[in-house]
Structures are given as C-alpha cells and as structure tokens.
Amino acid sequence: MVNIPKTRNTFCKKCKGYSAHKVSQAKKSKDNPRAQGNRRYARKQRGYGGQTKPILRRKAKVTKKLVLNLECTKCKFSHQKPLKRAKHVIFGGERKRKGEALVY
C-alpha cells in the first residue's frame, strides 16, 4: 500500500521554479479510434479471412503503474509523473508515527 501526500513541493516548468503542486491520480483516457494502430487493424480485418490477430485471453500483469497528475497551485500548469507499480494507493492518508501505541 502506498500513501501519497495531497500536496508536493516540486519544480514547475512554466513558472521556472519550485512551488506547491496538487497531487491526483491520472486516469486512462478514451482510446482514439483513428490512431495508427486502430486504422491498420481495421484495414487488416476487412474482407474474407476471419480474425487476423490473436485475441488476448489472459492478462500478463496483476497491477498497473501509478501515474500522478501534478498541478501547480500558482499557474495551474499540469504535468505527470510515473511511479512504480502498486496494488493500493491512498492520497493524504494518516502517516505512521514512531513508537506510537497500536490501536485495535
């Protein structure tokens, strides 16, 4: 489980300096039906001959890579930062303290 703070002080390309950024998780955008791969696939599928490419039957990965959206609080410019793989992500959760008693 990964706990990420909701704000992060990092470099902004537009402001050309360090400033606070609002952190959120990037979502997958809608596929473009006119992308080169889709155009090629549609062309290949036309006519006789059935299915031309293998249909993926099983997933290879269990998790997805975490991508952060970082939005500058000064100029509202947004950029993305990829992180490692994680199953569970929490934004702004409680931080662990050293030597604190366990609460059940």
Swiss-Prot record:
Biological process annotations from GO:
translation
Any single GO molecular-function term of the entry would be:
structural constituent of ribosome
Under the heading InterPro entries, the entry gives: Ribosomal_eL44, Ribosomal_LSU_eL42, Ribosomal_zn-bd
Name of one Pfam family that matches? Ribosomal_L44
Record's keyword terms, sorted: Ribonucleoprotein, Ribosomal protein
A GO cellular component entry from the record: ribonucleoprotein complex
Q: Which domain of life is it from?
A: Eukaryota
Q: Where is the stretch described as Disordered?
A: 22-56
Concerning its family, UniProt says: Belongs to the eukaryotic ribosomal protein eL42 family.
Q: What's this protein's name? A: Large ribosomal subunit protein eL42
Q: Which gene encodes it?
A: RPL44
